[in-house]
Structure formats: structure tokens, C-alpha cells
């Protein structure tokens, strides 16, 4: 037998395996690697594979007590990034046994927990993950999914409409409830707590829940439609979060909300399990995502966070607008929107999808378009996102010159007009403005909204390019 050979050896001798055939059960990752000058890409890719699986900086005696071949991550392919001098895409395969079942927390701790501070790399970005069915099947996934949500709400054949209540901080619970009522009464399906509304001195959570529940029931009785308000259950401890979710269920409201990145995946998964068991829909806000996903060469792409959310659980998630005030490049946004909604997504590098992803039968998540959108955007949004989406107009509802309810009316009229035009076979991309103008002729509320926002544009070149 060979004696134990101490010392430091190059990662690529063990962890760079270009001949490796990936298994159907492997978790595959695509990293954008920017090595330090003088570090060959193979070594950098192998270093990532090693440090995010079984390796450490030196050979250890206890390596002899396990089978590295069975457990090590492998960098199995490296390709240069077109148009970038020193960037490479490194593909890494991880054996399934490295991960705890049903834990997004553990998956991220393993894959991205340690390697991002690595000295041999100037920068590192996780672009995409392939989650094998063998792993995704250990998760509950979204509490209900798209079809069940439509059945609960009895709303079919169109996108859903929402509105974030503004000013986001400072309203009393009673005035907050009033704004909720006016929006729902005007024709919206949902209103939403802002992500930073938790339980502050000016409005404690229990007061808000009570007033919002009253607003929901009153609006439902008057419109004959099912209404909802995303009650933000995010809290400082998991116990407090569950307490809020339980109170929401006792009030009989249809939906609660959670900030899944700031709240953490462990808390989110617990809440998702509770929501399925108790018939609550779960709206997910992605506060803090840009800290992780905005840099092009470091961090994680949002499509990875979106996949993680589908596993951890949520029925809605914010996913950019393509047209409003926040970032989002069209093809790339549509790429992860499909990853949220569809069962099977083909690899398509033009949309940033590095791997074919088969979700089997995991329920889908509704993408939420929100941020700086208004009635003039409605045709584009209807065309880009299709029926299975939630369109959220915060300022685009509450900023209406006549008040909240007319603002809601304007949005609902615009949406119904766009859906009808599309169903009649008209081209929303080309005739969008015309469709809105026609509808405005018989809806004074819409006409007023059109007048206010006719000049507003948030035009900056998008940063998320391929």
C-alpha cells in the first residue's frame, strides 16, 4: 500500500476531469470565473470544484478514510467567455450525496458558501444550476402553484393585478386599510405590504392584519370577486413569523408574504410548509437580491435564486419588469420566468439558460412584474409575461390624480382591453398605444391616467447583457 503523501498539490490534478460523463443525479453548476493573473483557468475551475466539495488546501491523512472519487466535485468543462479577456465559464458536477435532502440552505452553503472569497480568483459568479429530479423531489416546492391559485381565486385567462400600498412607511393601520379597500374596490385582485413593512412603532402587525382583513371582506362583498392582500409575515425570529402566519390564517385571508432572502431559506421553507398545510398562498419578495445578483462578474445570477425559491416554496415571486424602473433584460428575464413557471426548460444560452432543467411535477411560481410600471406599459407587459403573471402597479395605481380607486379602475380597464385585443388576434407590440387610447375613450379613469404618465420613461441601458 502507498504511504500517505503529505504536502500541497495542484487542485487540477484531482478536481479537473474533462473526460467525466455527468450523471442524471448530479447537481451541475456553471460558474463565471475570473482568475488572478497567472492562474490557469483549469486550476481556477478545479479550485472552485474542490473548495465547494471535498477539497482543502493541503492533502490530509483522513482523505484515506473516504472515497474521494465518490464524493468530490469535478470541474468537467471550461470555456472562454466571448468578448471577455480573462473570464471563463467553469462547469462543475457535484455528486448528489454531498447535499442534505430538502435543504436549500445546505445546498447554498456547499456550493457558494466558501469559494467566493478564494484568493486565486479575482471574481466568481454562479450563473446557473441544474437541479436533478432526484434532488428536487425531496422538496415540497411552492405551497400551491399556478393552477391551484387560479382555482382558489376563480380568476382565469388573464394576468392578475396587484398594487403595493405607498407611502411604504408611516401610515397608520386604519389609513393603510382604507387604501387597501379603495384599491381592491376599484378592481385590483391584490394589494401588497411593502417588503419593509413588518411591525414598526407607527403600525404594529396585528393592527394592520385586522384592518386589512376588514378591507378585503368589504371589497369582496361589494365586487363579488375574491380579493387578497399580501400580509407580510416576515419577522425577526421564525417563531414570530409563524405567529403572524397563523393569525392571518385565523382571519381567513387568502395570502401571506415573506422576504425570502433577508428572512432566510430555512424560515421560508418552514413558512411554505405551513402555507400548504393551511391553504394560504405565499407571495415572495426578493428584497436584497441585487446585493447578490447585480454585479456581472461576481455573486449569483437571479435565475439561481429563482430556482432556489421554487424548491424552497413560494407561489409568487418578483421577477423584474423588462419595462419599468428596475433592471431586467428581456430575453434573460423571460429565461428565468420560464424556469419559474414551466415543467421542462431546454438549455438556451441566448436566454442565459446553461442547462436543461426538468422540474418533473413541481408546482410553478407566478412571476410578479413590479416597479415603475403604469397603464402605458400594459400592452407590453401582457405580451411579454402572458396570462400567468401578476402585474403590480404601486405608484401606477396610487398616483392617479383622482385617487386610489379610480387608479385601480384605470389599470383594470387597461388590462381587460389588452387581454381582449390579444384574444381578438391583434398585435399588442405594434398596436399597444392604440388599444389603450381606444379604451380610454369610454373610461374617464383610464383617460386621466394616460394623461398623467404619457411622458414618463425610465430609460437607462440595461446592464444584464450576455
From Swiss-Prot:
Sequence positions that bind substrate: 114, 164, 168, 286, 318, 370
Reaction catalysed by this enzyme: 2 (2R)-3-phosphoglycerate + 2 H(+) = D-ribulose 1,5-bisphosphate + CO2 + H2O; D-ribulose 1,5-bisphosphate + O2 = 2-phosphoglycolate + (2R)-3-phosphoglycerate + 2 H(+)
Pfam families assigned: RuBisCO_large, RuBisCO_large_N
Site (Transition state stabilizer): 325
A GO MF label: ribulose-bisphosphate carboxylase activity
Binding site for Mg(2+): 192, 194-195
Family: Belongs to the RuBisCO large chain family. Type I subfamily.
Annotated function: RuBisCO catalyzes two reactions: the carboxylation of D-ribulose 1,5-bisphosphate, the primary event in carbon dioxide fixation, as well as the oxidative fragmentation of the pentose substrate in the photorespiration process. Both reactions occur simultaneously and in competition at the same active site.
General remark: The basic functional RuBisCO is composed of a large chain homodimer in a 'head-to-tail' conformation. In form I RuBisCO this homodimer is arranged in a barrel-like tetramer with the small subunits forming a tetrameric 'cap' on each end of the 'barrel'.
Record-given protein name: Ribulose bisphosphate carboxylase large chain
Upper lineage: Eukaryota, Viridiplantae, Streptophyta, Embryophyta, Tracheophyta
Amino acid at each position: 500500500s502507498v504511504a500517505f503523501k503529505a504536502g500541497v498539490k495542484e487542485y487540477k490534478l484531482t478536481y479537473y476531469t474533462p473526460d467525466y460523463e455527468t450523471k442524471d443525479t448530479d447537481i451541475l453548476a456553471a460558474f463565471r470565473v475570473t482568475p488572478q493573473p497567472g492562474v490557469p483557468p483549469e486550476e481556477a475551475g478545479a479550485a472552485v470544484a474542490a473548495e465547494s466539495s471535498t477539497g482543502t488546501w493541503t492533502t490530509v491523512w483522513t482523505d484515506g478514510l473516504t472515497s474521494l472519487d465518490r464524493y468530490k466535485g469535478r470541474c468537467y468543462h471550461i470555456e472562454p467567455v466571448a468578448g471577455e479577456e480573462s473570464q471563463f465559464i467553469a462547469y462543475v458536477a457535484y455528486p448528489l450525496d454531498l447535499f442534505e435532502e430538502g435543504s436549500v440552505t445546505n445546498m447554498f452553503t456547499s456550493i457558494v458558501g466558501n469559494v467566493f472569497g478564494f484568493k486565486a480568483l479575482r471574481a466568481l459568479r454562479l450563473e446557473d444550476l441544474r437541479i436533478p429530479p432526484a434532488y428536487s423531489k425531496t422538496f415540497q416546492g411552492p405551497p400551491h402553484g399556478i393552477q391551484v391559485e387560479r382555482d382558489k381565486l376563480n380568476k382565469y385567462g388573464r394576468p392578475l393585478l396587484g398594487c403595493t400600498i405607498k407611502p411604504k412607511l408611516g401610515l397608520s393601520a386604519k389609513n393603510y386599510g382604507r387604501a387597501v379597500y379603495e384599491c381592491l374596490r376599484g378592481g385590483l385582485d391584490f394589494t401588497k405590504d411593502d417588503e419593509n413593512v413588518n411591525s414598526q412603532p407607527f403600525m404594529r402587525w396585528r393592527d394592520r392584519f385586522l384592518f386589512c382583513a376588514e378591507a378585503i371582506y368589504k371589497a369582496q362583498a361589494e365586487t363579488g370577486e375574491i380579493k387578497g392582500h399580501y400580509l407580510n409575515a416576515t419577522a425577526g425570529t421564525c417563531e414570530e413569523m409563524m405567529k403572524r402566519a397563523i393569525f392571518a390564517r385565523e382571519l381567513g385571508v387568502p395570502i401571506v408574504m415573506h422576504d425570502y432572502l433577508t428572512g432566510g431559506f430555512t424560515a421560508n421553507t418552514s413558512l411554505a410548509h405551513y402555507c400548504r398545510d393551511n391553504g394560504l398562498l405565499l407571495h415572495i419578495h426578493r428584497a436584497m437580491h441585487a446585493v447578490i445578483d447585480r454585479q456581472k462578474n461576481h455573486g449569483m445570477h437571479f435565475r439561481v435564486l429563482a430556482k432556489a425559491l421554487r424548491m424552497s416554496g413560494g407561489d409568487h415571486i418578483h421577477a423584474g419588469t423588462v419595462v419599468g424602473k428596475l433592471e431586467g433584460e428581456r430575453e434573460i428575464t423571460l429565461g428565468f420566468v420560464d424556469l419559474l413557471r414551466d415543467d421542462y426548460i431546454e438549455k438556451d444560452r441566448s436566454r442565459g439558460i446553461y442547462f436543461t432543467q426538468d422540474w418533473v411535477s413541481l408546482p410553478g411560481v407566478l412571476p410578479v412584474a413590479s416597479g415603475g410600471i403604469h397603464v402605458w406599459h400594459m400592452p407590453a407587459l401582457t405580451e411579454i409575461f402572458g396570462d400567468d403573471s401578476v402585474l403590480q402597479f404601486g405608484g401606477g395605481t396610487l398616483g392617479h390624480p383622482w385617487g386610489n380607486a379610480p387608479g385601480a379602475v384605470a389599470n383594470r380597464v387597461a388590462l381587460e382591453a389588452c387581454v381582449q385585443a390579444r384574444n381578438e388576434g391583434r398585435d399588442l407590440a405594434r398596436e399597444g398605444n392604440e388599444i389603450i387610447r381606444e379604451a380610454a375613450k369610454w373610461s374617464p379613469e383610464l383617460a386621466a391616467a394616460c394623461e398623467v404618465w404619457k411622458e414618463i420613461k425610465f430609460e437607462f441601458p440595461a446592464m444584464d447583457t450576455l
